[in-house]
UniProtKB/Swiss-Prot annotation:
GO molecular function: ferrochelatase activity; metal ion binding
GO biological process: heme biosynthetic process
One Pfam family of this chain: Ferrochelatase
Protein name: Ferrochelatase
Length: 335
């Protein structure tokens, strides 16, 4: 049997929390045509003359709040996960990390796999729910870099794992461990948002309030539907009553209509309607990052408290949890 490569792709982060490094990262990220779907002549001035100069100083301060000794949280947890995964997979796979908008790059990871002499490469976008802006964009980047490097090893793609038993099971375990002996009035599942225009590309999406719960091929391929499927699987495993949990979408950018309800609005409403003790779970992220630790862990808590909330619990992402490492190894071997 030939040697196999496994390429773990995540978005990455700035090299440091210095403003210039944050500017560079934001520019690379937002100039991706799958992230901001405008023609280049419109996207370039929007990103580099408007968004980045305004957001970079603010974002740099937020990165500083959550920065770890070894680097940004997403980079640290991704490296740890990859190292443990390599131990678990032993010589069945050569595991490498490629970050879309920072180092180590997808190109450098593919070079390493090429030099290792692998016969095929499984590309694993580390985003549980499928979206063109994440899974689609990362695989296209891998294809472009493979072509540039004249790779002979074929690329295969790991499907979205929004309903994978080990991903759901590890998430449930982390909820139980975090909230042991704690009183919780409501569980909020906060997923990364998308512009509605991205979701409407799937026929039938957002046509009715319950379209994401319909059992059809369209819902099966819809990011929003996959978010609800993940939340439902976790909630049911925790035996939560439907009235005790809800879904919201975070990290909106710009003036376009994004998926609703917004997480900050949901936190405000929950506090104002008497939910004193809440838990927030972020299952569109496999690694804690600025969006979970700062936006939700710090900013979300402030919003909740400002409107009358009391206890606020943030459940960690699956990160490098041993149960998740084992489960992901099993998933990879099954492909």
């Amino acid at each position: 049997m030939g040697k196999k490569g496994l390429l773990l792709i995540n978005i990455g982060s700035p090299k440091s929390y210095q403003v210039n490094d944050v500017k560079k990262y934001l520019s690379e990220f937002l100039m991706d045509e799958d992230v901001i779907t405008l023609p280049y002549v419109l996207r370039w001035p929007l990103v580099n003359l408007l968004i980045v100069p305004r957001r970079a100083p603010f974002s740099a301060e937020n990165y500083k709040k959550v920065w770890m000794k070894e680097g940004s949280p997403i980079a640290v947890y991704t490296r740890r996960f990859a190292a443990l995964l390599q131990e678990e997979l032993k010589d069945q796979f050569v595991v490498k990390v490629g970050l879309q908008y920072s180092e180590p790059s997808v190109e450098s990871a593919l070079k390493d796999l090429q030099q290792a002499g692998v016969d095929e490469i499984l590309v694993a976008p580390m985003f549980p729910q499928y979206a063109e802006a994440t899974n689609g964009s990362s695989f296209k980047l891998a294809e472009r870099m493979a072509k540039k490097l004249h790779l002979t090893a074929p690329l295969r793609r790991l499907p979205a794992f929004f309903d994978d038993a080990s991903f759901v099971g590890t998430s449930v375990k982390l909820v139980e461990e975090t909230l042991q002996d704690k009183e919780v009035d409501h569980y909020l599942f906060s997923f990364h948002g998308l512009p509605e225009s991205h979701v409407r590309k799937i026929p039938g999406c957002l046509t009715t309030e319950d379209c994401c719960f319909e059992k059809n091929a369209c819902a099966k391929n819809c990011y929003r539907a996959q978010c609800f499927a993940t939340a439902t699987a976790i909630a049911e495993s925790l035996n939560l009553a439907p009235s005790h949990w809800s879904v919201a979408f975070q990290s909106r950018l710009g003036r376009a209509e994004w998926l609703k309800p917004a997480t900050d609005h949901s936190l405000e409403v929950l506090a104002k309607t008497g939910k004193k003790n809440i838990a927030v779970i972020c299952p569109s992220f496999v690694a804690d990052c600025i969006e979970t630790l700062e936006e939700i862990g710090i900013g979300g808590q402030e919003t909740f408290h400002e409107h009358g909330g009391d206890q606020y619990y943030l459940v960690p992402c699956v990160n490098d949890n041993p149960k998740w490492v084992q489960g992901f190894a099993d998933l990879v071997k099954s492909i």
